[in-house]
Design a protein with these regions (language model features):
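Conserved ABC transporter NBD signature motif
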Residues: 24-34, 40-41
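Conserved ABC ATPase signature
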Residues: 98-102
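ABC transporter nucleotide-binding domain
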Residues: 139-228
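Catalytic Walker B motif of ABC-type/P-loop ATPase nucleotide-binding domains
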Residues: 123-127
Length: 257
């Protein structure tokens, strides 16, 4: 996870062999990333980039047959996997539609299927829910959880809700570096005692807090302006500890510390 430009997509392109690392070592299951090993690595990986064009004039099924063939999947395995994943993604009834006729969410689901056709050990997905409506976002997140039962799933996002709903482990990037890598619970623990509820009476008091602290939420209420203030120490006498820390609170606290 990280803001736009943090380096998430670049890292994924290195992991999928689209880009070559300029320094350091990368390995997958003990296999070092170098040109002699790229073919072995690619067979272990399924990849869905943030933007993918899947042949608008082909039907869903035709597109998947073609993509599976490029991955070297046998005809029998390919037929079984396409049938299975079309059902798993609720696309069976749409398999004879042209790709250009699909919604954005449906196209992402087809993209997920193509990434799974070679039965990868490692599924890498860049921004899986970008541009999707809330219902499709939930559907994609649930699919990722299902797929993670028997493989490693790595996805990038700047949407905190995606992580909160799907992950137990996460890494946070900023300007090409890792600020954190570990459990979700560990990140929440890091912000413990540093999230405060504060209700101020007017906009001037609110501006003063915003000038000196990170604010994770702000809401106008009947008796003033309610704010969640992130600080190691108590910001002012009106602030009380917030013990209901969200992943968004913890993320903002870490990235702005």
């Amino acid at each position: 996870m990280g803001e736009n430009g943090a380096g998430k997509t670049t890292l994924m392109r290195v992991l999928t062999t689209v880009l070559k690392q300029t320094e350091g070592l990368v390995s997958l299951d003990g296999i070092l990333y170098n040109e002699g090993n790229y073919e072995k690595i690619q067979k272990k990986i399924g990849y869905l980039p943030q933007e993918i064009d899947l042949y608008p004039n082909l039907t869903v099924k035709e597109c998947l047959v073609y993509m599976g063939g490029l991955s070297g999947v046998s005809t029998n395995d390919l037929k079984q996997r396409i049938t299975y994943y079309l059902e798993k993604t609720s696309l069976t009834e749409h398999q004879n539609k042209k790709m250009r006729q699909l919604s954005g969410g449906m196209k992402r689901r087809v993209g997920l299927i193509q990434a799974l056709l070679n039965n990868p050990d490692f599924l890498i997905i860049d921004e899986p829910t970008t541009g999707l409506d809330p219902e499709e976002r939930i559907r994609i997140r649930n699919l990722l959880v299902d797929f993670s039962k028997d493989r490693t799933v790595l996805f990038s996002t700047h949407v905190v809700e995606d992580l909160a709903a799907t992950c137990t482990q996460l890494a946070i990037m900023k300007k090409g570096n890792f600020l954190y890598s570990g459990s979700v619970s560990g990140l929440l623990e890091n912000a413990k005692g540093c999230v405060w509820n504060c209700t101020v009476q007017n906009a001037e008091e609110a501006r003063l807090l915003e000038a000196n602290y990170s604010i994770s939420s702000k809401q106008y209420v009947e008796n003033g302006i309610h704010m969640k203030v992130l600080s190691k120490g108590k910001p002012n006498e009106k602030c009380v500890p917030d013990n209901d820390i969200t992943l968004e609170d913890a993320y903002i606290y870490l990235t702005n510390s």
